[in-house]
Amino acid sequence: MKTYTKADFMTDLMAGIIVGIVALPLAIAFGIASGVSPEKGIITAIVAGFIISFLGGSKVQIGGPTGAFIVIIYGIIQEYGIDGLMVATMMAGVLLILLGIFKLGTVIKFIPYPIIIGFTSGIAVTIFTTQIADIFGLDFKGEKVPGDFIGKWILYFHHFDTVNWGNVIVSVVSVFIIAITPKFSKKVPGSLVAIILVTVGVYCLKMYGGITCIDTIGDRFSIKAQLLEAAVPALDWEAIKNLFPVAITIAVLGAIESLLSAAVADGVIGDRHDSNTELIAQGIANFVSPIFGGIPATGAIARTMTNINNGGKSPVAGIVHAVVLLLILLFLMPLAQYIPMACLAGVLVIVSYNMSGWRVFKGLLKNPKSDVAVLLITFFLTVIFDLTVAIEVGLVIACVLFMKRVMETTKISVITDEIDPNNESDLEVHEEHLMIPQGVEVYEINGPYFFGIATKFEEIMSRLGDRPKIRIIRMRKVPFIDSTGIHNLTTLCEMSQKENIHIILSGVNEKVHKVLEKSGFYELLGEENICSNINEALEVATREIAEINAK
């Protein structure tokens, strides 16, 4: 910020004003779709938006409520009420802060792409499903809307004879306006244009045409200007235990979406965000937002891109966006009561379409079968069950896939005759050829020695079926070893000692050396059997063979 100029401030000011105006209809739509009042959506955009811009690790990230949280929030409110939502969001905030403090921001980026697309596509389908009632103006006659996907569609079909064609027309017109606006202006958001035009049109029809069948926000909510008021929810240990899985879902989804948004922004502006700082900011935002009546928030790709496209260069634009929304909440909020519910449904239809990434989804179906299986499992779990189940299963799948790929990259080879220097990439071998004495086997490990490959040694040795006098384990290309790997080596050493087979380690790097030394493995093996390179290891083996043969 040392080179920040007045011109930069004016650019950020204009970008912030535009983003604030763009964020207004989305905040209202996301709030209502989540099962809370429109004010709560705007409060979230104000509080979380300010904190994420002020403390975040990205210069241009815009935070606030997003479509990804609609399904989760709605489900929490149905089961635990508003207080449960507040507690779950604050817990998620703490989890996000911990992720950032322990520098796990980069780990989030390793979640496989098919899982992310499965999540987002599933969420898109679910958001679209939640808007069917408002698109068609269905009257459920007081019947409670089920939280699950299949239950919703059964209810819709049972009450499809109550279609309000006025709502249908408003929804179609709204979608049409949003779709064609970019052809006339890339900077003016279609959602804002649609809400202004449709709201004015419906108001005129109501006032001068006597048409009152189209539902508006004011028909369902009491809208008023208000100051931000702080209130801490009552904390109950039983509720905390029950809400912990949901909090994990909010935290993981928030982390994925915010870091994905920041990464997209980096690609456009040529910058690099700090993942861990961003997670800490997201965590603080989600901890503070519920205190003022907000809902879960994260980085929003659409608003972030609007910020960039309108010249936003620094966090000032995001702060201005929050201030603009605060002014709207204080002075213009009563006007929101005239916005038709079907128009907001049209906005969310476009949001769900953009979120679906159907072209990417279709492209991933051509990938290897394992990727396709992961994609479809995550997608259908998100749609048919809920996002909590999908994320839990998705993370398990991500871990399994990661372990599988690491296992595939770790190789163990056996050399029984000679080592060719032409095959050595690190110049460890200083001779023309190193002959391996009779009765000696050299095992070369290339990759991490962790629980996933610990049994490979046993498989290779049982396959060879012989019993050499000495085994040299060459570990120059082992970057790390875990407790299972240490246990495997210890067991191998103990079994070998019982069978009078000598074990020698070669080329252990400093990091692995410290771990093995700390574990007590070297006391079992003996310091004399730890060699810095293969030359030294073969010299020790040659002497040992000579002593064995002399007996």
Where are these regions (language model features)?
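Transmembrane helical cores of multi-pass ion-transport proteins
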Residues: 1-417, 421
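Short, contiguous clusters of charged residues that form electrostatic/catalytic patches at enzyme active sites
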Residues: 15, 175, 179, 455, ...
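Active-site-adjacent beta-strand anchor residues
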Residues: 63, 505-506, 531
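Generic hydrophobic alpha-helical segments
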Residues: 73, 153, 457-461, 537, ...
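Conserved beta-strand scaffold positions in the cores of enzyme catalytic domains, especially
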Residues: 220, 442-444, 530-531
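The feature marks cytosolic C-terminal regulatory regions of anion transporters and related permeases
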Residues: 354-524, 542-550
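Short acidic-hydrophobic, aromatic-tinged amphipathic segments that line or gate anion-handling sites
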Residues: 524-540
